[in-house]
Amino acid sequence: MEYTLYKNRSYRSVISAGFGLYFTQFRLFFKASWIMALIYAAVFAALGTLCAIKLPAITAEIMKQTLVQHQLLTREIAEEYLITGGIFIVLTLLYIVVEAFTFATVLNKLKEHQDTDKMMVPRRWFGVRTKLMGRTLKGYLFSLLVILIPVLAIAGLIYVLLKYVALAPITLEVTALIATLFIVLLSFPLIYVAMKYILNKGGYFSVFSKAYGTGLSHWGHIFTTCLIGGIIISILMGIFCLPAIVLTQANVMAQEGFLNGDPLGMPDYANLLTIVTFFLTGFVLVYLYMPLLLVCYYMYGSIERYEQEKNKLKI
Protein backbone atom coordinates (compact mmCIF):
# COMPACT_ATOMS: atom_id res chain seq x y z
CA MET A 1 0.00 0.00 0.00
CA GLU A 2 1.19 3.52 -0.83
CA TYR A 3 1.41 5.80 2.22
CA THR A 4 2.16 9.09 0.43
CA LEU A 5 0.31 11.92 2.16
CA TYR A 6 -0.74 14.16 -0.72
CA LYS A 7 -2.94 11.90 -2.78
CA ASN A 8 -6.62 12.00 -3.70
CA ARG A 9 -8.35 9.35 -1.63
CA SER A 10 -11.91 8.27 -0.92
CA TYR A 11 -12.96 7.95 2.70
CA ARG A 12 -12.33 4.19 2.49
CA SER A 13 -8.81 4.73 1.17
CA VAL A 14 -8.15 7.35 3.85
CA ILE A 15 -9.20 4.96 6.63
CA SER A 16 -7.23 2.11 5.04
CA ALA A 17 -4.10 4.28 4.73
CA GLY A 18 -4.38 5.51 8.33
CA PHE A 19 -4.78 2.04 9.82
CA GLY A 20 -2.18 0.62 7.43
CA LEU A 21 0.45 3.16 8.49
CA TYR A 22 -0.40 2.49 12.14
CA PHE A 23 0.17 -1.26 11.88
CA THR A 24 3.24 -1.11 9.65
CA GLN A 25 4.94 1.58 11.77
CA PHE A 26 3.60 0.63 15.22
CA ARG A 27 7.07 0.12 16.71
CA LEU A 28 8.09 3.61 15.55
CA PHE A 29 4.99 5.26 17.01
CA PHE A 30 5.26 3.28 20.24
CA LYS A 31 8.92 4.17 20.72
CA ALA A 32 8.16 7.85 20.11
CA SER A 33 5.18 8.03 22.47
CA TRP A 34 5.40 5.43 25.26
CA ILE A 35 6.79 7.78 27.93
CA MET A 36 4.04 10.36 27.35
CA ALA A 37 1.55 7.48 27.18
CA LEU A 38 2.58 6.46 30.71
CA ILE A 39 2.11 10.04 31.93
CA TYR A 40 -1.26 10.18 30.18
CA ALA A 41 -2.25 6.89 31.82
CA ALA A 42 -1.32 8.25 35.26
CA VAL A 43 -3.47 11.36 34.78
CA PHE A 44 -6.28 9.24 33.33
CA ALA A 45 -6.08 6.93 36.35
CA ALA A 46 -6.26 9.85 38.77
CA LEU A 47 -9.22 11.43 36.98
CA GLY A 48 -10.99 8.11 36.47
CA THR A 49 -10.57 7.05 40.10
CA LEU A 50 -11.88 10.42 41.26
CA CYS A 51 -14.98 10.03 39.07
CA ALA A 52 -15.49 6.35 39.91
CA ILE A 53 -14.95 6.45 43.69
CA LYS A 54 -14.71 9.90 45.24
CA LEU A 55 -17.47 11.77 43.42
CA PRO A 56 -20.10 9.01 43.88
CA ALA A 57 -19.18 8.77 47.58
CA ILE A 58 -19.57 12.51 48.16
CA THR A 59 -22.78 12.64 46.12
CA ALA A 60 -24.23 9.76 48.15
CA GLU A 61 -23.31 11.50 51.41
CA ILE A 62 -24.89 14.76 50.27
CA MET A 63 -28.09 12.99 49.18
CA LYS A 64 -28.21 11.08 52.46
CA GLN A 65 -27.97 14.27 54.54
CA THR A 66 -30.37 16.36 52.44
CA LEU A 67 -32.93 13.85 51.13
CA VAL A 68 -32.93 11.03 53.68
CA GLN A 69 -32.06 12.78 56.94
CA HIS A 70 -33.52 16.14 55.82
CA GLN A 71 -30.58 18.06 57.27
CA LEU A 72 -28.40 20.88 56.07
CA LEU A 73 -25.01 19.89 54.73
CA THR A 74 -22.32 19.70 57.36
CA ARG A 75 -19.38 22.02 56.92
CA GLU A 76 -17.00 19.09 56.46
CA ILE A 77 -19.01 17.61 53.58
CA ALA A 78 -19.44 21.00 51.90
CA GLU A 79 -15.69 21.68 52.10
CA GLU A 80 -14.87 18.19 50.85
CA TYR A 81 -17.26 18.67 47.93
CA LEU A 82 -15.64 21.98 46.95
CA ILE A 83 -12.13 20.56 47.27
CA THR A 84 -13.05 17.51 45.19
CA GLY A 85 -14.66 19.75 42.57
CA GLY A 86 -11.49 21.85 42.42
CA ILE A 87 -9.33 18.75 42.05
CA PHE A 88 -11.63 17.53 39.28
CA ILE A 89 -11.23 20.80 37.36
CA VAL A 90 -7.43 20.76 37.77
CA LEU A 91 -7.19 17.13 36.65
CA THR A 92 -9.46 17.80 33.66
CA LEU A 93 -7.26 20.69 32.51
CA LEU A 94 -4.14 18.58 33.12
CA TYR A 95 -5.72 15.76 31.12
CA ILE A 96 -6.25 18.08 28.13
CA VAL A 97 -2.64 19.27 28.28
CA VAL A 98 -1.16 15.79 28.65
CA GLU A 99 -3.37 14.38 25.88
CA ALA A 100 -2.20 17.13 23.53
CA PHE A 101 1.45 16.52 24.46
CA THR A 102 1.02 12.75 24.00
CA PHE A 103 -0.34 13.06 20.49
CA ALA A 104 2.28 15.70 19.67
CA THR A 105 4.88 12.92 19.89
CA VAL A 106 3.06 11.17 17.04
CA LEU A 107 2.42 14.39 15.13
CA ASN A 108 6.18 15.04 15.19
CA LYS A 109 6.67 11.85 13.19
CA LEU A 110 3.79 12.77 10.87
CA LYS A 111 5.38 16.17 10.29
CA GLU A 112 8.57 14.35 9.35
CA HIS A 113 6.55 12.13 7.00
CA GLN A 114 4.84 15.16 5.46
CA ASP A 115 8.15 16.88 4.74
CA THR A 116 10.28 13.91 3.63
CA ASP A 117 7.76 11.14 2.83
CA LYS A 118 9.56 8.93 5.36
CA MET A 119 9.90 8.54 9.14
CA MET A 120 12.99 7.64 11.15
CA VAL A 121 12.69 5.34 14.15
CA PRO A 122 13.80 7.24 17.30
CA ARG A 123 17.31 6.22 18.32
CA ARG A 124 16.59 6.14 22.05
CA TRP A 125 13.77 4.55 24.00
CA PHE A 126 14.14 7.04 26.84
CA GLY A 127 13.51 10.37 25.22
CA VAL A 128 10.60 12.66 24.42
CA ARG A 129 10.66 15.02 21.47
CA THR A 130 8.95 18.22 22.58
CA LYS A 131 8.67 19.82 19.15
CA LEU A 132 5.05 20.58 18.17
CA MET A 133 3.82 20.09 21.76
CA GLY A 134 3.01 23.78 22.19
CA ARG A 135 1.47 24.01 18.73
CA THR A 136 -0.65 20.91 19.32
CA LEU A 137 -1.89 22.26 22.64
CA LYS A 138 -2.78 25.60 21.05
CA GLY A 139 -4.59 23.77 18.26
CA TYR A 140 -6.61 21.89 20.90
CA LEU A 141 -7.45 24.98 22.93
CA PHE A 142 -8.26 27.27 20.01
CA SER A 143 -10.54 24.63 18.48
CA LEU A 144 -12.35 24.29 21.81
CA LEU A 145 -12.64 28.08 21.98
CA VAL A 146 -14.17 28.26 18.49
CA ILE A 147 -16.77 25.68 19.56
CA LEU A 148 -17.35 27.28 22.97
CA ILE A 149 -18.21 30.75 21.62
CA PRO A 150 -21.42 29.70 19.76
CA VAL A 151 -22.34 27.36 22.63
CA LEU A 152 -22.21 30.26 25.09
CA ALA A 153 -24.10 32.49 22.65
CA ILE A 154 -26.90 29.93 22.32
CA ALA A 155 -26.98 29.38 26.09
CA GLY A 156 -27.33 33.14 26.58
CA LEU A 157 -30.10 33.31 23.99
CA ILE A 158 -32.01 30.47 25.68
CA TYR A 159 -31.60 32.21 29.04
CA VAL A 160 -33.06 35.43 27.61
CA LEU A 161 -35.96 33.56 26.00
CA LEU A 162 -36.63 31.68 29.22
CA LYS A 163 -36.65 34.88 31.26
CA TYR A 164 -38.43 37.33 28.99
CA VAL A 165 -40.46 35.27 26.50
CA ALA A 166 -43.30 32.95 27.42
CA LEU A 167 -42.29 29.75 25.66
CA ALA A 168 -43.10 26.17 26.58
CA PRO A 169 -40.15 24.26 28.10
CA ILE A 170 -40.41 21.64 25.37
CA THR A 171 -39.93 24.37 22.75
CA LEU A 172 -36.73 25.54 24.43
CA GLU A 173 -35.49 21.96 24.78
CA VAL A 174 -36.06 21.25 21.09
CA THR A 175 -34.41 24.56 20.15
CA ALA A 176 -31.39 23.79 22.33
CA LEU A 177 -31.13 20.28 20.87
CA ILE A 178 -31.27 21.50 17.27
CA ALA A 179 -28.76 24.28 17.96
CA THR A 180 -26.37 21.84 19.67
CA LEU A 181 -26.62 19.40 16.77
CA PHE A 182 -25.97 22.25 14.33
CA ILE A 183 -22.82 23.29 16.22
CA VAL A 184 -21.57 19.69 16.36
CA LEU A 185 -22.02 19.27 12.61
CA LEU A 186 -20.28 22.58 11.87
CA SER A 187 -17.35 21.62 14.11
CA PHE A 188 -16.17 18.76 11.87
CA PRO A 189 -14.16 21.04 9.52
CA LEU A 190 -12.16 22.11 12.60
CA ILE A 191 -10.41 18.73 12.43
CA TYR A 192 -8.94 19.72 9.07
CA VAL A 193 -8.16 23.22 10.36
CA ALA A 194 -6.35 21.87 13.44
CA MET A 195 -4.31 19.38 11.41
CA LYS A 196 -3.31 22.06 8.90
CA TYR A 197 -2.36 24.45 11.71
CA ILE A 198 -0.28 21.92 13.65
CA LEU A 199 1.67 20.63 10.67
CA ASN A 200 2.36 23.99 9.00
CA LYS A 201 3.39 27.53 9.86
CA GLY A 202 1.10 30.44 10.67
CA GLY A 203 -1.19 31.55 13.48
CA TYR A 204 -4.30 29.54 14.28
CA PHE A 205 -6.85 32.19 13.33
CA SER A 206 -4.93 33.03 10.18
CA VAL A 207 -5.11 29.36 9.19
CA PHE A 208 -8.72 29.16 10.37
CA SER A 209 -9.85 32.08 8.19
CA LYS A 210 -8.56 30.32 5.07
CA ALA A 211 -8.98 26.64 5.92
CA TYR A 212 -12.41 26.50 7.55
CA GLY A 213 -14.20 27.30 4.29
CA THR A 214 -12.15 24.61 2.56
CA GLY A 215 -13.02 22.14 5.29
CA LEU A 216 -16.68 23.10 5.03
CA SER A 217 -16.66 22.40 1.28
CA HIS A 218 -15.34 18.90 2.09
CA TRP A 219 -17.76 18.42 5.00
CA GLY A 220 -19.23 15.18 3.64
CA HIS A 221 -15.78 13.62 3.22
CA ILE A 222 -14.70 14.68 6.72
CA PHE A 223 -17.94 13.58 8.36
CA THR A 224 -18.03 10.17 6.67
CA THR A 225 -14.36 9.48 7.39
CA CYS A 226 -14.66 10.46 11.06
CA LEU A 227 -17.94 8.58 11.47
CA ILE A 228 -16.66 5.27 10.08
CA GLY A 229 -13.27 5.58 11.80
CA GLY A 230 -14.95 6.64 15.03
CA ILE A 231 -17.29 3.64 14.97
CA ILE A 232 -14.36 1.24 14.57
CA ILE A 233 -12.42 2.86 17.42
CA SER A 234 -15.52 3.08 19.63
CA ILE A 235 -16.13 -0.66 19.32
CA LEU A 236 -12.53 -1.38 20.34
CA MET A 237 -12.77 1.13 23.18
CA GLY A 238 -15.94 -0.51 24.44
CA ILE A 239 -14.10 -3.83 24.66
CA PHE A 240 -10.91 -2.57 26.31
CA CYS A 241 -12.69 -0.14 28.64
CA LEU A 242 -15.10 -2.79 29.92
CA PRO A 243 -13.15 -3.56 33.15
CA ALA A 244 -13.05 0.15 34.06
CA ILE A 245 -16.76 0.51 33.26
CA VAL A 246 -17.66 -2.52 35.41
CA LEU A 247 -15.62 -1.20 38.35
CA THR A 248 -17.25 2.23 38.05
CA GLN A 249 -20.72 0.70 38.01
CA ALA A 250 -19.85 -1.46 41.04
CA ASN A 251 -18.69 1.62 42.97
CA VAL A 252 -21.82 3.56 42.05
CA MET A 253 -24.10 0.67 43.02
CA ALA A 254 -22.26 0.32 46.34
CA GLN A 255 -22.91 4.00 47.06
CA GLU A 256 -26.58 3.58 46.13
CA GLY A 257 -26.79 0.74 48.66
CA PHE A 258 -25.09 2.94 51.26
CA LEU A 259 -27.68 5.64 50.55
CA ASN A 260 -30.42 3.11 51.28
CA GLY A 261 -28.85 2.13 54.60
CA ASP A 262 -26.82 -0.89 53.53
CA PRO A 263 -23.14 -1.26 54.53
CA LEU A 264 -20.60 -0.27 51.89
CA GLY A 265 -19.97 -3.54 50.07
CA MET A 266 -16.68 -2.81 48.29
CA PRO A 267 -13.55 -4.74 49.39
CA ASP A 268 -10.55 -2.98 50.93
CA TYR A 269 -8.48 -3.34 47.78
CA ALA A 270 -11.15 -1.69 45.58
CA ASN A 271 -9.34 1.66 45.46
CA LEU A 272 -6.03 0.11 44.39
CA LEU A 273 -7.77 -2.12 41.86
CA THR A 274 -9.60 0.89 40.39
CA ILE A 275 -6.37 2.90 40.08
CA VAL A 276 -4.50 0.04 38.38
CA THR A 277 -7.42 -0.70 36.05
CA PHE A 278 -7.78 2.92 34.95
CA PHE A 279 -4.01 3.23 34.51
CA LEU A 280 -3.85 0.21 32.19
CA THR A 281 -6.98 1.37 30.37
CA GLY A 282 -5.50 4.85 29.85
CA PHE A 283 -2.28 3.42 28.42
CA VAL A 284 -4.20 1.21 25.99
CA LEU A 285 -6.48 4.12 25.00
CA VAL A 286 -3.52 6.09 23.66
CA TYR A 287 -2.88 3.37 21.10
CA LEU A 288 -6.58 2.99 20.33
CA TYR A 289 -6.93 6.72 19.61
CA MET A 290 -3.77 6.77 17.50
CA PRO A 291 -5.19 5.15 14.32
CA LEU A 292 -7.91 7.82 14.26
CA LEU A 293 -5.21 10.50 14.42
CA LEU A 294 -3.49 8.90 11.43
CA VAL A 295 -6.82 8.71 9.59
CA CYS A 296 -7.28 12.47 10.15
CA TYR A 297 -3.73 12.99 8.87
CA TYR A 298 -4.50 11.25 5.57
CA MET A 299 -7.86 12.98 5.35
CA TYR A 300 -6.01 16.31 5.60
CA GLY A 301 -3.56 15.19 2.88
CA SER A 302 -6.38 14.11 0.58
CA ILE A 303 -8.14 17.47 0.91
CA GLU A 304 -4.88 19.35 0.35
CA ARG A 305 -4.19 17.36 -2.81
CA TYR A 306 -7.70 17.95 -4.13
CA GLU A 307 -7.37 21.71 -3.55
CA GLN A 308 -3.97 21.77 -5.29
CA GLU A 309 -5.38 20.04 -8.36
CA LYS A 310 -8.42 22.32 -8.38
CA ASN A 311 -6.20 25.42 -8.30
CA LYS A 312 -4.09 24.06 -11.17
CA LEU A 313 -7.19 23.54 -13.30
CA LYS A 314 -8.24 27.14 -12.68
CA ILE A 315 -4.87 28.31 -13.98
Question: Which stretches of residues belong to each language-model region?
Answer:
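A conserved helix-loop-strand patch within extracytoplasmic ligand-binding domains
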Residues: R75-T92, F103, L107, F126-G139, ...
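Hydrophobic alpha-helical transmembrane segments in multi-pass membrane proteins
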Residues: A32-L55, T84-A100, K138-K163, T171-S187, ...
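Helix-boundary and loop/linker segments of multi-pass membrane transporters
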Residues: G20-F23, L73-Y81, W125-T130, A166-P169, ...
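Generic N-terminal leader segments that precede the first folded domain
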Residues: T4-G20, T24-R27, W34-Y81, G85, ...
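Interfacial aromatic "cap" segments that immediately flank transmembrane helices
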Residues: Y3, K7-A42, P122-I149, F188-I239, ...
